Regions:
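Conserved N-terminal entry element of GNAT/NAT acetyltransferase domains
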Residues: 1-18, 164-167
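A short, internal acetyl-CoA/4′-phosphopantetheine-binding micro-motif in the GNAT/acyltransferase core
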Residues: 63, 94-105
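A short, polar/charged loop-to-alpha-helix boundary motif
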Residues: 79-88
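Conserved beta-strand in the GNAT
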Residues: 61, 68-77
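Conserved acetyl-CoA-binding loop-helix of GNAT-fold acetyltransferases
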Residues: 105-122, 141-145
Length: 167
């Protein structure tokens, strides 16, 4: 039976931490659930999800019409310059995003990205940043369409002013 999923979005809470771990895994293996996660990715999971503060940083989780988790995005405001992969400043959140493979092609990632930028704007952030593999031309092209630009000297970091984001 074919169906077009309908998504509901809500702010992430502490109870979503386990699901965010799954999404972090999907992001680390670029959606390939048979992919191996290296040592640095395992350590990164603690920083990106284990130390995530839902009250201060928040995020968005998406569900389909049957209340099945479909994807999510979460913000990390890094305090130390050595933390994170796309850490530009303490007031610029790095966003992490992933969508379950079965929901690919339904523009859910666009809705999540838009919701994350709106959330960051409400929190007073001037910009949002993200890490994207320099060889992932498809993703980089998509982010550029939304207004993201490469950060000079950081070939794997992109940033957009929250006022310039276009979905």
């Amino acid at each position: 039976m074919d169906y077009t999923p309908e998504f509901q979005l809500r702010e992430a809470t502490e109870s979503d931490r386990t699901y965010l771990r799954r999404l972090n895994y999907l992001a680390d293996v670029f959606g390939n659930e048979e992919g191996d996660v290296g040592h640095s990715e395992r350590e990164g999971a603690e920083a990106y999800v284990g130390q995530w503060d839902p009250e201060r940083e928040s995020g968005i989780v998406a569900f389909d019409q049957f209340h099945v988790p479909a994807g999510g995005v979460w913000l990390r405001y890094w305090q130390s310059p050595d933390d994170g992969y796309a850490n530009l400043a303490p007031n610029i959140p790095e966003i992490a995003i992933a969508v379950e493979n079965r929901y690919a092609g339904n523009r859910l990632a666009v809705r999540l990205l838009q919701a994350a930028v709106e959330l960051a704007k409400r929190q007073g952030a001037p910009k949002v940043a993200l890490w994207v593999d320099p060889d992932n031309d498809r993703a980089r092209h998509r982010y550029e369409k939304f207004g993201f630009a490469n950060v000079e000297g950081e070939d794997d970091v992109m940033v957009v002013d929250v006022e310039d984001f276009t979905a």
